[in-house]
Amino acid sequence: MNLFIKIINKYLYKLIYNFIDFYQKIISPILPARCRYYPTCSNYGKQALAWHGVLNGSLLLLKRISRCHPLGGHGVDFVPLPLASYRYQYLSCNPVAHGQFHGFYVYRDNHGYVTRLNHMMKLT
């Protein structure tokens, strides 16, 4: 059952992504610029699909398209990061008092917000 869902998700991802690509390359050059947001709705859709998957990415894209009209908003509206994939750990305010660290150390963040954002930007 899980394999079947993965196959369906992969097929739907390719279908929606190719439709957006078709729109960007064939339909969009014919029409005048219409999108009131940055990034454009089609680029937003590609990022939302890549970052959030088929179901959540499609819902984000539909919400964005429904806002993109003359009475709707305008401006910069980036795709929200998928924060559910982060690992959170509690760090005490005073680690030296607990004997955890002695001396100077460099903290390398492999799972933080900025690291995840940079990684996601490389994927799209």
Curated annotation (Swiss-Prot):
It is found in: Cell inner membrane. Keywords: Cell inner membrane, Cell membrane, Membrane. Its main location: membrane. GO terms for cellular component: plasma membrane. InterPro entries: Membr_insert_effic_factor_YidD (IPR002696). Coiled coil: none annotated. It is a peripheral membrane protein. Belongs to the UPF0161 family. Could be involved in insertion of integral membrane proteins into the membrane. This is Putative membrane protein insertion efficiency factor.
